[in-house]
């Protein structure tokens, strides 16, 4: 997903940056956060209504600005990798009338089988990390058959381990294999 990164305490004209890219409906979220914390979606002309919250977020962390993709309404895919090896996937869906997929906003999740093409596209996102993470959750949506990365979660992501019987063992082996011998 095209993304504008705004660093902590940086002054940026979000409206001008978004307009230059042709975005009319945007999502603004912290670079570090979880559970939809301080995530806002709004039409660009409503930016003044959210500017105070965005400034508060920028006081102690950066933000990501992305175009709102209506594909999220059909669900966000989470593909889990342990030491670079695909393990399993979940589909997170928002409740009717919302865009947030987190359970605290009424979102649900379910096991899902994904094709090798999506696994390969999600795996390609991991190779851009500075080092291969022991675990990663690759979140995104599918548009026209293409996986669009929304977030690469590598710090304590929800991994849906209880929903896949083999996943806890895969995760444990990946961690064990990284420990000094």
Regions found by a protein language model. Give the residues of each.
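Generic hydrophobic alpha-helical segments
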Residues: 14-18, 53-54, 122, 175
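Phosphate-binding site of ATP-dependent enzymes
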Residues: 22, 35-126, 130, 141, ...
């Amino acid at each position: 997903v095209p993304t504008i990164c705004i660093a902590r305490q940086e002054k940026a004209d979000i409206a001008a940056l978004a307009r230059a890219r042709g975005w009319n409906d945007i999502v603004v979220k912290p670079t570090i956060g979880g559970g939809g914390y301080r995530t806002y979606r709004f039409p660009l002309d409503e930016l003044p209504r959210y500017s105070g919250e965005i400034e508060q977020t920028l006081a102690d962390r950066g933000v990501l600005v992305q175009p709102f993709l209506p594909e999220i309404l059909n669900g966000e895919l989470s593909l889990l990798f342990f030491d670079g090896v695909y393990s399993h996937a979940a589909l997170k869906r928002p409740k009717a009338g919302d865009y947030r997929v987190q359970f605290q906003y009424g979102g649900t999740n379910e096991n899902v089988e994904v094709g090798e093409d999506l696994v390969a596209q999600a795996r390609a996102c991991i190779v851009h990390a500075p080092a291969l993470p022991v675990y990663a959750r690759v979140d995104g949506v599918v548009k026209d058959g293409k996986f669009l990365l929304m977030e690469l979660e590598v710090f304590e992501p929800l991994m849906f381990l209880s929903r896949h019987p083999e996943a806890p063992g895969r995760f444990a082996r990946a961690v064990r294999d990284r420990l000094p011998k």
